[in-house]
């Protein structure tokens, strides 16, 4: 699994700072495995982000906030639960054992520390609800119902990629696109972007990684929302582990919005 990271405007930030809060986010994976690592990003922010802990857990069939307690797995970073990511930087967790099933929804909960950027590194068009709770005096427990009662936003924060160990014969396709790829017109929390359908079809025959690197409003050359495709290509495509195929589905915003001729 992977997503394209972006600068977060004020309108896409939570109502309150992420400082001393817990944010539960949900991703829909393509294929499964038993060994993985998580990539976190602070690449679009100007201040460090302090993280107290990060843990994974299976959710139920509805892909919501609820987690199955026996599946909770805390990740480490160089052997420690807490980590600080500098501005403009990203990092991987230590490799961890976790039974990940093909096509499942996985919760990733980040417990933030005191220091968080004014503008987080995010992906605006998650088409999936994230659940944020206050934790000033304590860290919210995995099964805490306050996740359901807390603030809800349809964005991902600080998530970049989830790498699953597999053999070299497993194909992985990355998709570079704009809003059509990002999920415009799909149903929030239903995991029905066209790349989700592609993943389902491909994985019906064999394990097949499908990485959605779409950004709504994105352009190829210049303008649009977030960094244009030509600028983000190295990070978002070449920077992904195991990719051996590429779909480029961009250009409509360049044609429709640009005053230049290319």
Regions found by a protein language model. Name each.
Residues 207-208, 255:
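Secondary-structure boundary/capping residues
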Residues 172-177, 181, 208-214, 244-250:
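Structural recognition of the beta-strand scaffold that forms the well-ordered cores
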Residues 1-176, 186-188, 204:
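N-terminal secretory targeting modules
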Residues 199, 213-216:
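Aromatic-Pro/Gly-enriched surface loop or interdomain linker
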Residues 123, 157, 193, 221-223:
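Extended interaction regions within the primary functional domain
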Residues 170-195, 216-219:
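Catalytic nucleophile-elbow at a beta strand-turn-alpha helix junction centered on a G-D-S/GDSL motif
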Residues 186, 215-262:
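Oxyanion-hole/transition-state-stabilizing segment in secreted/luminal serine hydrolases
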Residues 160-169, 190-204, 225-242:
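Short amphipathic alpha-helices and their capping/turn segments at secondary-structure boundaries
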């Amino acid at each position: 699994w992977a997503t394209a990271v972006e600068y977060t405007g004020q309108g896409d930030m939570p109502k309150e700072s992420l400082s001393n809060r817990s944010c539960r986010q949900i991703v829909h994976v393509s294929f499964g495995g038993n060994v993985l690592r998580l990539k976190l990003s602070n690449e679009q922010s100007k201040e460090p982000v302090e993280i107290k802990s990060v843990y994974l857990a299976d959710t139920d069939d509805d892909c919501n906030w609820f987690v199955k307690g026996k599946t909770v797995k805390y990740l480490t970073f160089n052997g420690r639960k807490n980590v600080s990511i500098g501005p403009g930087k990203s990092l991987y967790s230590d490799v961890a054992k976790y039974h990940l099933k093909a096509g499942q929804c996985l919760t990733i909960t980040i417990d933030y520390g005191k220091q968080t950027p004014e503008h987080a590194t995010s992906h605006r068009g998650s088409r999936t609800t994230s659940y944020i709770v206050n934790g000033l005096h304590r860290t919210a427990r995995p099964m805490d119902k306050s996740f359901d009662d807390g603030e809800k936003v349809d964005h991902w924060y600080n998530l970049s990629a989830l790498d699953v160990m597999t053999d070299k014969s497993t194909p992985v396709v990355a998709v570079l696109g704009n809003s059509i790829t990002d999920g415009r017109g799909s149903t929030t929390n239903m995991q029905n972007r066209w790349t989700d359908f592609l993943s389902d079809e491909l994985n019906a025959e064999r394990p097949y990684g499908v990485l959605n690197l779409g950004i709504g409003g994105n352009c190829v050359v210049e303008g649009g929302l977030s960094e244009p495709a030509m600028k983000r290509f190295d990070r978002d495509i070449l920077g992904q582990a195991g990719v051996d195929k590429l779909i480029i589905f961009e250009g409509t915003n360049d044609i429709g919005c640009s005053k230049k001729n290319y």
